[in-house]
């Protein structure tokens, strides 16, 4: 057997040497294609999973692929994972449970996601319902299904897991759909199914069928409620009967944070390894071991903290006691992880060489970086062009990888000015292979570092220009609220998007609907109080001026809205003035000055920041 066949067919645990980052995704794609069935790549964290997934999109766009996320909340948290993340995870589990085991399916996931136990595979596989135009579907039955399987009723459907009912029209955003769907009923007859844009509410496609799957691993029906009540009382005794989580579930409600008692809603829990099956190929990032040890230590620390706090009979800041389940009930242990890996064919990637019969050398190495040339103040583009030309002469297929189409176009233009040609665009790895043999392919592929093999060389944008100074914009999450609120001190002034200037007094836990909710306590004029749920923290921003002379807004008053309207008018006036200036400039003419060819492209290519969308 050649090396690739051995990696694809061997049931043993093997180390894939000579597989630097980037090349590992190409090898993994080839293995998944050759094996068929389920192939799972476990990344050390979400950032690594995202970059690996993006590389797979380039190297193997034709192979069915999905992401399986972990919850985006801390272990033993009082809040649930975000609805979007919970829906993505539940949708991925349903899809994996329903897979036939034969066709190739790649699962890209993380250590955190794999350590989490899941709802039983049988429950997720059987948890879907489908409908098509002309069929009969009781709207009340659909409503009950959506409510029990984690969907949230909303006025307008915008996020995965939302649904809305307006007469004979039902809008739903299914777990694994790209867009929400609108179902038009006449009585119990489904007349049409359409997907629509959640922002404009306009129809995008007419659909012939639609499938709804759970957006939560908790199915809240009579059987699961009964199991939860029995299990909660058995574990925590009679004292647990007054717990807000217990009382909410007993009343048929889905309290915030209930997922952290997932084991009580089911007869047993499975693992992602169980979903993937015994024949699944498991591939491991080089940093998986460290990430696993760190995560298990974190889980133990959170559990011990909850356990110690629970001895006093109450949580922090007067919150109800947190009755935590032992880690083994919700997460895999070190031994269980090792046993699951050993029971399946597994491949550990590394860029280095390791001797032994269980190692397979794929002959890859990290590509050349041009750091020395940048520091020596040489023309790095000239050096890169000569290096690419030398690689081509050695018989390698050469690709220039950039992070965006604009950057790729600029890089190609600059390298062409320095004598590298022909440079041709390619959409995928397959397309690059179809170019004429002497062509350099320019591609959009977000690799941090390039690599070389016997027949292939990829030079990345970062190899030539140095590290990118990425400044991604992230929506603040409720799971980060303690850190964010911790950076504010009681007495600090904040601005609420709807209510204006107020004073932050601190975090406070309120019991609403028999469940605890963490809120930020804000004070306004007249000592009026506003309690802002932590999940809405993005509505706040810091007050950036001197606080001594600031006057608090009146809660519900018109002054804040008037100031906002005045500011908007000033912005419109400024925009009008800028438009007038632009029009005046456009009306004037002058002699055109042409810069030297390629000079601007070189300047633009050195821009170190990520381009905005």
Language model feature labels by segment:
Residues 2-8, 594-613:
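Conserved pre-motif I regulatory segment
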Residues 1-549, 567-592:
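Conserved beta-alpha structural segments and adjacent helices that either
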């Amino acid at each position: 057997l050649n090396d690739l066949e051995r990696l694809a067919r061997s049931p043993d645990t093997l180390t894939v040497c000579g597989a630097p980052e980037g090349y590992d995704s190409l090898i993994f794609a080839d293995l998944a294609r050759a094996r068929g069935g389920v192939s799972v790549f476990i990344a050390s964290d979400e950032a690594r999973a995202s970059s690996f997934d993006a590389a797979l999109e380039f190297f193997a766009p034709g192979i069915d692929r999905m992401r399986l996320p972990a919850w985006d909340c801390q272990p033993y948290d009082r809040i649930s994972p975000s609805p979007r993340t919970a829906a993505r995870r539940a949708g991925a589990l349903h899809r994996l449970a329903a897979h036939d085991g034969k066709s190739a399916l790649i699962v890209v996931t993380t250590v955190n996601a794999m350590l989490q136990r899941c709802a039983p595979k049988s429950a997720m596989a059987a948890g879907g319902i489908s409908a098509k135009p002309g069929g009969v579907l009781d709207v009340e039955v659909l409503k009950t299904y959506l409510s029990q399987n984690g969907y949230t009723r909303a006025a307008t459907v915008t996020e995965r897991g939302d649904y809305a009912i307006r007469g004979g029209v039902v809008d739903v955003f299914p777990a694994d759909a790209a867009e929400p769907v609108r179902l038009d009923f006449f009585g119990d007859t489904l007349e049409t199914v359409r997907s629509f844009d959640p922002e404009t509410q306009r129809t995008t496609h007419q659909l012939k069928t639609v499938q709804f799957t759970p957006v939560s691993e908790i199915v809240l029906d009579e059987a699961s409620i009964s199991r939860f009540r029995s299990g909660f009382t058995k574990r925590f005794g009679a004292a647990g009967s007054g717990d807000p989580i217990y009382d909410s579930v007993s009343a048929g409600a889905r309290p915030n944070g209930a997922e952290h008692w997932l084991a009580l809603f089911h007869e047993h829990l499975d693992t992602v390894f169980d979903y993937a099956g015994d024949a699944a190929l498991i591939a491991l990032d080089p940093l998986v071991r460290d990430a696993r040890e760190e995560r298990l230590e974190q889980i133990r620390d959170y559990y011990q903290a909850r356990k110690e706090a629970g001895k006093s009979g109450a949580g922090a800041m007067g919150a109800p006691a947190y009755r935590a389940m032992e880690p083994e009930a919700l997460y895999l242990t070190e031994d269980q992880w090792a046993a699951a890996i050993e029971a399946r064919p597994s491949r550990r990637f590394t860029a280095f060489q390791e001797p032994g019969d269980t190692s397979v050398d794929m002959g890859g190495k990290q590509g050349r970086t041009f750091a020395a040339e940048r520091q020596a103040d040489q023309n790095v583009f000239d050096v890169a062009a000569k290096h690419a030309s030398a690689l081509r002469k050695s018989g390698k297929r050469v690709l220039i990888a950039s992070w965006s189409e604009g950057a790729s176009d600029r890089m190609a233009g600059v390298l062409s000015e320095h004598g590298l040609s022909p440079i041709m665009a390619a959409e995928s790895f397959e397309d690059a292979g179809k170019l004429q043999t002497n062509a350099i392919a320019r591609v959009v592929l977000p690799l941090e570092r390039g690599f070389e093999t016997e027949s292939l060389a990829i030079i990345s944008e970062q190899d030539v220009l140095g590290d990118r100074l990425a400044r991604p914009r992230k929506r603040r999450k409720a799971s980060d609220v303690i850190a964010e609120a911790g950076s504010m001190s009681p007495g600090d002034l904040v601005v609420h998007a709807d209510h204006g200037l107020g004073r932050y007094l601190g975090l406070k836990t309120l019991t609403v609907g028999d469940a605890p909710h963490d809120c930020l306590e804000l004070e306004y004029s007249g000592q009026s109080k506003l309690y802002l749920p932590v999940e809405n923290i993005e509505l706040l921003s810091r007050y950036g001026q001197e606080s001594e002379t600031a006057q608090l807004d009146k809660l519900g008053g018109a002054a804040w809205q008037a100031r906002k309207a005045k500011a908007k008018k000033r912005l419109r006036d400024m925009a009008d003035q800028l438009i007038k200036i632009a029009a005046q400039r456009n009306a004037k003419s002058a002699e055109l000055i042409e810069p030297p060819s390629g000079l601007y492209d070189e300047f633009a290519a050195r821009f170190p920041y990520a381009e905005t969308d």
